[in-house]
């Protein structure tokens, strides 16, 4: 029995979102194929994600200098503990699905905040004399990114969404990465349903092997 962490970052209702609607079709097929697996849902707009702020940096700095977690201020403990909670949840999963829209050639800031919360030295990566090393190379972990954009950007230099997520997953040791991209729905609106339909078919195929 595997644990799937399903992370969404979209303000639209599912029926009005290309990425969420494709994600739902993926999840329906995945659960049909893997009914015993555990799925954990994280909505980055709804759920409170702790950003890295002055208290977090101060707390981390104190602990690097040998101070205990118990010696941190109340705010430092609360905020660092919140980040650790998300990092531990991420580590506990075997599979990851991120469902996002494109915002200005990237993705919403809430996803970057979440990535900062799970990329924690000593938990998901470590520094070595030869460079950083991902600590999540075990368990055959895999990641799927379901992403949508109004224009055509995937595979181009200006795309800072899918390539970044693939890179940061690899940074933590998760090398098995796949993407499903719905694009062009605003650029060619009369073909939007065709674009979404193709993505749904791909999502169902990926779900059967994920």
Curated annotation (Swiss-Prot):
It catalyses: 2 a quinone + NADH + H(+) = 2 a 1,4-benzosemiquinone + NAD(+); N,N-dimethyl-1,4-phenylenediamine + anthranilate + 2 NAD(+) = 2-(4-dimethylaminophenyl)diazenylbenzoate + 2 NADH + 2 H(+). The keyword Hydrolase does not apply. InterPro entries: Flavodoxin_fold, Flavoprotein-like_sf, FMN-dep_NADH:Q_OxRdtase_AzoR1, NADH:quinone_OxRdtase_FMN_depd. Binds 1 FMN per subunit. The keyword Amino-acid biosynthesis does not apply. Pfam families: Flavodoxin_2. Keywords: Flavoprotein, FMN, NAD, Oxidoreductase. HAMAP family: Azoreductase_type1 (MF_01216). Belongs to the azoreductase type 1 family. Homodimer. This is FMN-dependent NADH:quinone oxidoreductase. It comes from Geotalea uraniireducens (strain Rf4).
């Amino acid at each position: 029995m595997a644990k799937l962490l399903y992370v969404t970052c979209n303000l639209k209702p599912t029926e009005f979102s290309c990425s969420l609607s494709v994600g739902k079709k993926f999840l329906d097929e995945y659960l049909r194929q893997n009914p015993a697996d555990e799925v954990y849902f994280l909505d980055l707009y709804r759920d409170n994600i702790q950003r890295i702020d002055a208290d977090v940096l101060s707390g981390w700095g104190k602990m690097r200098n040998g101070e205990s977690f118990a010696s941190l201020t109340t705010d430092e403990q609360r905020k660092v503990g919140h980040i650790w909670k998300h990092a531990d949840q991420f580590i506990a999963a075997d599979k990851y699905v991120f469902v996002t829209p494109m915002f200005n050639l990237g993705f919403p800031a809430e996803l970057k905040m979440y990535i900062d919360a799970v990329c924690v030295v000593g938990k998901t990566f470590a520094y070595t004399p030869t460079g950083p090393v991902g600590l999540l190379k075990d368990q055959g972990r895999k990641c799927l990114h379901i992403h949508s954009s109004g224009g055509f950007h995937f595979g181009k230099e200006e795309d800072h969404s899918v390539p970044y997520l693939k890179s940061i997953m690899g940074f933590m040791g998760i090398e098995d990465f796949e993407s499903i991209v719905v694009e062009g729905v605003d650029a060619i609106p009369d073909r939007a349903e065709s674009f979404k339909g193709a993505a749904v078919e791909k999502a169902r195929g990926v779900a059967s092997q994920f």
